[in-house]
C-alpha cells in the first residue's frame, strides 16, 4: 500500500503479545512471548503494561526491535458455555421466560406508579411500563433518541425512588459503560456507584469508582462486604461482570438494565440473567434490555448458512438463527402494543435532512424530530472563501461526491481518501473564517477498511494541521453509539465482491434494512457527506435510493 503511515489496528486497552524481532527469522513461534495491555498510544510511541511481573530485565533488551500482535482471551468462550449451563440450571420461571416455554409469560405489577413527573407523555408511558414489568421489559432505541441520556437515566431515578432497590447497569462495550457513568454523575439521587472492570479500560474520570479501588480502602472482609452491600448502583461491561459472578454470592439486584443488548448474543447474556444467589433465588429480579435490532448486531464469524437453526422445536420457540440476540428474539415474539416492549420515537441528534433517509426507509416514518437548536438553525458558515470545496460545505447539509477511480481488488481508494481530506480541510477553514472552535466533535470519518483509514490519515497529515490529529477515522462498528457534527462516509467499494460484503441486512415486515448503513448515516448531527463510485453502488438497490435521496436534498 502506498505511504508508510501505520494502519490503526490497535487501540487503547487492547490485549496484545510482543516479542523481540531483530531479524527476519524472529517470529512468535521462535521467540519468548510476553503478554501485555496497551496503556497509551501516540503516532510515534506505544506504551505496554505487562500482564505479569518481569524481574529479569535482560529478557527485554532496550536496543532490540519488537513485534506487537493482537492477543485474545479464550475465557470468553468458556464463559458462554458456562452461561448456557447456568440457563439450564436457572429457576423454572426464569428459564421458561428465556427459552420461550409454553405457559411461561411475563407479568406486571399495576400498582406501581411513577415518582416523578415528565414533560413527555411518551417518556412517562415507557418509564411506567419499565417500572411495572415484573420479569422483563424491552426498549427499542433508534439513533439519537436518548436511550442512555434520557431513558436509562430516568429509569435509574425511578428505581432509586423505591427504598433499598438495588440496580445493576450493564453494557457491551467500555465506551458505553463510560457513557453510563457520565449520566450517573448528573443524577442527584445517585450518591455513589461502583464500577466492575479494569483500570485501563475505564475512563480516568471514573476510575475512583472501580471495585478494585474501593477494595483498597477496606481494611478487612467485613468492611469490603459493607461497602458492596451499601452501594445501590453497580456498573459493568458484560465481560467484566461475567468474570466476577461471585458478586452474586454477596449481593442480589432487583433490576438489571442492559444497554446495547441487540449487540449481545444469547450465550453471552443468558448466564448473567440466570444467575442465582446462594439461597437459590434469582440473583437479578427482573431485566430491562435496551437496544435496536435495526442497528449493528453482534459480530459473528459464522456465515448465515452455518448459523441457521433447523430444529423445529427450537424454531417454534423463536430460535431461528444463532446470530440473533436475545433482545431481538424476545422482541419479535411479543405482540404489537405489548406492555413489555416500547420504542423511543423522538430523535434529538440529526438535522431533519439527515434523518429523513433512515426514518423513511428503515423506521417507516416512525421517528419525529425533537427540534433541538441545531436541528432547526441554519449552518453557521456565513463567511466563506472562493474554494469550491468551501462553498459546497458551507451551504449543503448533505451531499454525495461521486468518484471515478477504482483500485481493483484493493481495500483502499486513493480518490476517495484525497476528497475526504479536502472536505475536512475546507471544513476546518470555514471554522476559522467564522470564529468557531474546531475539535474532535466537529467531524468524524467512517470507512470500511483499515487500509482506507490509513490512506485518509496520510492525506490529512499532508496538511500539517495539528487539529487533524484528534479527528476520529474508524470503521462503522467503532462508531456505533457515537456522534459528530459532520460525518464523512467513504464507501471504498472498488468491485462487486466488496459491494456484496459491505451491507449487514435484516428484514422486518418485508422491509430490507441495511444495519451498517443505518449506523453510518445516523452518526451526523449537522452535516453528512458520502463518497463512492455511483456506477458500482447503484447496483445495490438501497445504495441507489440513497444516492438519489442525497442528490435531491442537495439540489434543493
Place the predicted regions along the sequence by residue.
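Conserved helicase NTPase catalytic core signature
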Residues: 169-172, 177, 181-182, 188-254, ...
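Pre-ATPase regulatory/linker segments immediately N-terminal to the P-loop/RecA-like helicase/translocase core
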Residues: 4-128, 132, 182-185, 190, ...
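Pre-Walker A (Motif I) flank of P-loop NTPase domains
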Residues: 122, 133-139, 164-165, 232
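Short alpha-helix capping/helix-loop boundary micro-motifs
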Residues: 1-6, 471-473
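Conserved helicase motor core of SF1/SF2 NTP-dependent helicases
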Residues: 161-165, 173-174, 239-241, 247, ...
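Walker A/P-loop NTP-binding motif
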Residues: 148-162, 179, 183-185, 274-275
Amino acid at each position: 500500500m502506498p505511504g508508510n503511515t501505520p494502519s490503526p489496528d490497535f487501540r487503547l486497552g487492547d490485549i496484545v503479545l510482543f516479542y523481540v524481532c531483530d531479524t527476519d527469522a524472529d517470529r512468535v513461534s521462535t521467540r519468548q512471548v510476553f503478554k501485555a495491555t496497551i496503556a497509551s498510544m501516540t503516532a510515534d510511541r506505544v506504551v505496554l503494561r505487562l500482564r505479569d511481573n518481569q524481574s529479569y530485565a535482560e529478557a527485554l533488551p532496550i536496543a532490540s526491535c519488537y513485534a506487537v500482535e493482537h492477543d485474545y482471551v479464550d475465557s470468553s468462550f468458556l464463559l458462554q458455555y458456562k452461561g448456557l449451563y447456568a440457563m439450564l440450571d436457572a429457576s423454572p420461571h426464569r428459564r421458561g421466560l428465556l427459552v420461550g416455554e409454553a405457559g411461561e409469560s411475563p407479568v406486571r405489577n399495576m400498582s406501581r406508579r411513577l415518582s416523578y413527573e415528565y414533560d413527555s407523555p411518551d417518556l412517562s408511558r415507557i418509564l411506567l411500563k419499565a417500572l411495572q414489568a415484573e420479569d422483563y421489559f424491552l426498549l427499542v432505541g433508534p439513533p439519537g433518541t436518548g436511550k442512555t441520556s434520557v431513558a436509562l437515566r430516568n429509569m435509574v431515578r425511578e428505581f432509586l425512588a423505591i427504598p433499598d432497590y438495588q440496580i445493576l447497569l450493564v453494557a457491551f462495550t467500555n465506551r458505553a459503560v463510560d457513557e453510563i457513568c457520565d449520566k450517573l454523575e448528573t443524577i442527584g439521587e445517585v450518591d455513589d456507584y461502583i464500577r466492575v472492570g479494569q483500570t485501563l479500560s475505564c475512563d480516568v474520570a471514573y476510575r475512583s469508582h472501580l471495585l478494585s479501588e474501593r477494595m483498597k480502602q477496606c481494611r478487612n472482609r467485613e468492611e469490603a462486604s459493607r461497602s458492596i452491600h451499601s452501594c445501590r448502583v453497580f456498573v459493568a461491561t458484560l465481560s467484566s461482570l461475567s468474570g466476577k459472578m461471585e458478586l452474586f454470592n454477596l449481593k442480589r439486584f432487583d433490576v438489571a438494565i442492559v444497554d446495547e443488548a441487540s449487540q449481545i448474543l444469547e450465550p453471552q447474556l443468558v448466564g448473567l440473567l440466570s444467575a442465582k444467589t446462594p439461597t437459590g433465588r434469582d440473583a437479578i429480579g427482573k431485566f430491562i434490555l435496551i437496544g435496536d435490532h435495526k442497528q449493528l448486531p453482534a459480530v459473528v464469524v459464522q456465515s448465515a448458512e452455518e448459523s441457521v437453526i433447523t430444529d423445529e422445536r427450537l424454531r417454534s420457540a423463536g430460535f431461528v438463527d444463532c446470530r440473533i440476540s436475545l433482545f431481538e428474539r424476545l422482541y419479535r415474539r411479543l405482540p404489537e402494543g405489548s406492555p413489555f416492549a416500547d420504542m423511543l420515537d423522538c430523535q434529538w441528534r440529526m438535522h431533519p435532512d439527515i434523518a429523513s433517509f433512515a426514518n423513511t426507509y428503515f423506521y417507516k416514518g416512525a421517528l419525529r424530530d425533537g427540534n433541538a437548536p441545531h436541528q432547526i438553525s441554519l449552518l453557521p458558515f456565513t463567511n466563506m472563501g472562493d474554494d469550491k470545496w468551501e462553498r459546497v460545505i458551507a451551504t449543503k447539509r448533505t451531499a454525495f461526491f461521486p468518484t471515478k477511480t477504482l483500485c481493483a481488488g484493493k481495500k483502499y481508494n486513493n480518490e476517495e481518501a484525497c476528497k475526504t481530506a479536502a472536505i475536512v480541510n475546507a471544513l476546518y477553514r470555514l471554522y476559522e473564517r467564522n470564529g468557531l472552535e474546531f475539535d474532535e466533535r466537529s467531524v468524524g470519518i467512517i470507512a470500511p477498511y483499515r487500509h482506507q483509514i490509513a490512506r485518509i490519515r496520510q492525506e490529512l497529515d499532508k496538511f500539517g494541521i495539528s487539529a487533524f490529529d484528534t479527528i476520529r477515522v474508524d470503521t462503522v462498528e467503532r462508531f456505533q453509539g457515537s456522534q459528530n457534527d459532520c460525518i464523512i462516509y467513504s464507501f471504498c467499494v472498488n468491485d462487486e465482491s466488496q459491494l456484496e460484503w459491505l451491507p449487514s441486512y435484516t428484514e422486518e415486515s418485508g422491509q430490507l434494512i441495511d444495519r451498517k448503513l443505518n449506523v453510518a448515516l445516523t452518526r451526523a448531527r449537522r452535516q453528512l457527506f458520502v463518497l463512492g463510485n455511483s456506477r458500482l453502488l447503484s447496483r445495490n438497490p438501497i445504495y441507489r435510493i440513497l444516492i438519489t435521496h442525497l442528490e435531491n436534498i442537495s439540489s434543493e
